[in-house]
Structures are given as C-alpha cells and as structure tokens.
C-alpha cells in the first residue's frame, strides 16, 4: 500500500472513490479547485496495482482574523481496504503538509452528529475536539459537529526530526550540511503560497461516512 501526493490525473478516480463511499458528493471542478490551489495538501492511497483505494481532499482556510489553519474537505477509504489504518495515515500526511507548507496551527473538519464511527476516530485516535455544533449543516437537515485538531504537537515532532537529521549529517561529516543547506526548525513551517481564493461552495466541507468502519470517513 502506498500513500502519495495526489496529482491532477488522480482527480477523476478520487471522485469515483467519493461516489462509491459517501452521500456527500462534489462536481469535478471542486476537485480541480483543491488540486490547483493547494496541490501539496491532498493525498491518495493506492494498492499494489496502482488503483486508488482512498483519498483525503484538503485545503487551507483564509480567515484574516484567525491563525493559519487547514480544513479537511473529504476523507474516504473503499470498503475493501478499511481497517488498515489508511484514514489515519492520509489524515496525518495532509496535516503534516499543512504545517510544512503553510505553517498551519490547527486543522478543522465537519462530521455528522450521527456518525459515531467517525467521531470515535477523530476524537480517540486523531485528537480532534468538538468546537461547536452547526445546526442543519447537511442538505438533509442533520446537524454537524465542527471539530479541530491542534497541530502544535506534530509541529514539535517535525522540528525534532529536523534537528536529529541535521545532527546526523554533521556527525557523518556531510559537506552539504556543513555548508548550512538544511533549514532551521522554524523555516520548515513557514508559509509558501497561501494566496488562493475560495470557490464559494458553502456545503462542500463536510467530513462524514455512512458506514461503521473507522477507515471510511469522509
């Protein structure tokens, strides 16, 4: 199983995976909006034959009154590949990319109040916390939990890894690191391109799933 950054030619298969797994679906232009605006943030899981079996579609929010933060638009894993930890791996990879590319401080998502499997995954495994309830968020009138995950712990871990990597190269006498080519810990989290605009879709940031498997969240 391989987790990698999504490419433009993956978007149709990501949409197909979404249609198979979830009741909340999106037009292809919305996938392109994410892929072109934040190409670093969306990831796919592919099997040994290169077929997409899961994905995470993510973006950065653009609120001038808040700290930099990302948002998970959709997360899904096909039923045939659930309970392998793919949802957690996809989520962690997207969160890491938010930190490294845009200096994100937290990541948010929405989930149906009735989706107990998703709530369990987000709360108990991924350390999300409910921030508020949004009444009638979904098209069928169901309320949504707005949830947030603080990324400070992951940021600290990435900094530690960077320091260890730098020290290892210094011990080995690498000419590249002796010349100071590695960034310092803070530089790894500086924003690079946070300038894209929202497409205006109001009901496209839900994260929910119709099954009881933990790895099928979207």
From Swiss-Prot:
EC main group: transferase
UniProt-annotated stretches for the region Disordered: 175-218
Catalyzed reaction equations: N-terminal glycyl-[protein] + acetyl-CoA = N-terminal N(alpha)-acetylglycyl-[protein] + CoA + H(+); N-terminal L-alanyl-[protein] + acetyl-CoA = N-terminal N(alpha)-acetyl-L-alanyl-[protein] + CoA + H(+); N-terminal L-seryl-[protein] + acetyl-CoA = N-terminal N(alpha)-acetyl-L-seryl-[protein] + CoA + H(+); N-terminal L-valyl-[protein] + acetyl-CoA = N-terminal N(alpha)-acetyl-L-valyl-[protein] + CoA + H(+)
Enzyme nomenclature, EC number: 2.3.1.255
GO MF annotation: an example: protein N-terminal-serine acetyltransferase activity
N-acetyltransferase domain mapped to chain residues: 1-152
Oligomer status and interactors: Component of the N-terminal acetyltransferase A (NatA) complex composed of NAA11 and NAA15. Interacts with HIF1A.
Protein name, UniProt field: N-alpha-acetyltransferase 11
Organism of derivation: Mus musculus
Source taxonomy: Eukaryota, Metazoa, Chordata, Craniata, Vertebrata
């Amino acid at each position: 199983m391989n987790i990698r950054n999504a490419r433009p030619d993956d978007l149709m298969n990501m949409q197909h995976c979404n249609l198979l797994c979830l009741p909340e679906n999106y037009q292809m232009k919305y996938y392109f909006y994410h892929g072109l605006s934040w190409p670093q943030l969306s990831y796919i899981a592919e099997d040994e034959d290169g077929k997409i079996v899961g994905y995470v579609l993510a973006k950065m929010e653009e609120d001038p009154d808040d700290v930099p933060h990302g948002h998970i638009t959709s997360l899904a894993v096909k039923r045939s590949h659930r309970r392998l930890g793919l949802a957690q791996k996809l989520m962690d990879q997207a969160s890491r990319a938010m930190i490294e590319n845009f200096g994100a401080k937290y990541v948010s998502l929405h989930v149906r109040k009735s989706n107990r499997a998703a709530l369990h995954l987000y709360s108990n495994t991924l350390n999300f916390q409910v921030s508020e309830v949004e009444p009638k968020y979904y098209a069928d009138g169901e309320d949504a939990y707005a949830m947030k995950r603080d990324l400070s712990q992951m940021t600290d871990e990435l900094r530690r890894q960077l320091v260890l990597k730098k020290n290892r190269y210094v011990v080995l006498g690498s000419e590249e690191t002796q010349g100071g080519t590695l960034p310092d810990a803070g530089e790894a989290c500086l924003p690079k391109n946070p300038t894209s605009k929202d497409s205006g879709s109001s009901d496209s940031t839900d994260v929910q799933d119709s099954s009881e498997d933990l790895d099928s969240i979207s």
